Amino acid sequence: MKTMNVIKATMLLATVLVTVGCASDDTIENEQQAGNKMPAHAVVFSGENEARPEYTRTTLSSHAKGSETAVEWEASDHVWVKDDAGTYQKSMVTVIPNPQNKAFALFGLTNGSFTGANHSVVYTGKNSTSATEVEIKAEQTQTVTNSFAHLGESGDCGVATATKKPDGTYRFKLEHKAAYICIYPRIEEHDRLQKNVRLTKIVLISSSGPIAGKYDFSTGTLGSTPTGDASNIITLTTPSGEISTATRVDTSYYAVIAPGTHTLRAKYYITDPSTNVSKVVIKDLGTMTFTSGKFTDVTAWINKDLIEYNSYYAWDAKKPYWYGYESVQPFTTGTSNPNYPQPGDERYEASTWGDGINNPLFTPNAPRHVPTMNELSWYFMKGDARWDSNGAYVFNGHLQQGRGVWFKKMERIKADNASLVAGAGGDVKAMGLNYGDAYHDYSANHSVYMLYATPSNTITTEEDQINYFFVPFCIPVYAGGVCLTRDGSAYWTTNREYMFHALTHDLEMYTFGYPEGILGLPAVPML
């Protein structure tokens, strides 16, 4: 994660024209004739762009990861200017003379007197009613990807000093005081899933204090804590757009956040319009410092912990079960196709015994592999298995929903059972657990092992899901070319003799020996 300037201190120039006498009236009249519709006798602040076009305000025009950001004025913006009496006056009219150059805007004030060498200017957000209070919204909405059009209404703010120039005009340069986060979600490796799901909202949760609310702005700096409506949560509603396969600017999302050091968790809500199934993906962002006037970029690998359960193989085969015949793969119970693997085909099962050697998925020392018998015993004994009749999972490129079990992720099992893992030599692949926490190496011989686990009915909440993953027991398996769906599904282990089977009608899971016949089962690396 990197930070960068939103807008430098040399961000915006504005000219103040005090309308006194005929000459000033002529100036206003000329502006009106140009279609700017400024009221007569108004004090006009003309926001002028400097040589570099990105030094403007207030809607995001463009942002590239790791670089400065260009923003523009909107016709709905207004500023507050402190008059000769020390009272902040609100601009009543905002005009952008040239739609092609929104870096230049006119602000008309009809109240107050402005004759000093300097006048304080503040911007407290779109539709603000106070020059001394800013509200960073807990509910923010982005209607288009890579658009910060909600910048002003979500809590942006800034200060400046307008200085009188020899020609009688006043100019100021705005300094931003809110902080900003840019999120780049992506879905890698699963092209079908990427095309089928949409991002509906992002929720940022702080465990270290408020990140939104109403803040005192009387000193020109946001107060350290909210004075009202404090919130540890910011919800950004997104436009339900596609999620990119890479970190890209055109599919990014923005939020205003209170400056400071925050420990954050992000929840990404995705939905599949075809199946009407939704799922939340939770990521801990850690502790980050958000600086006034700067963006913090955050990348998010949405599907990193989403397992796709239709990676079918015969045991230790080099190619997937339906490789080359994906278009005719049967998915309905009882249907079949004759193009299933035959002897001599790379899709056919390996004839060796023990652990796999042909396919990394079946090789225990590979970075991503189906569970070994030893690893499976840790899931059974210490995985806190929980039943769920409506868990969301990924199958055939879509989000689906059905019965299955939640397990603790292996990293959580290790953390919760550090002493037991140490007693097993620190390697759960090398030594498993038996009932009564007795150590047992299930890969040492070929006797049949009946590992049982009975899931509880404990509800797995959204917050729990950061430490758990869902295994569906309702997806098909293949015997030859026939699609079978029974009370429970089966999954491969690295050892040819065993598979992991689930019977959902009595909530038991067990392993059993390899039956006769060519089987196509999911080869799933568990988390």
Predicted features, each with a name:
Residues K2-M381:
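Sec-type signal peptide cleavage vicinity
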Residues R347-E349, G354-G356, F362-D388, A392-V394, ...:
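Long, compositionally biased low-complexity segments
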Residues C22, V81, T87-V95, N101-L109, ...:
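Short beta-strand element of the conserved SAM-dependent methyltransferase core
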Residues R403-L527:
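C-terminal, surface-exposed recognition/capping segments
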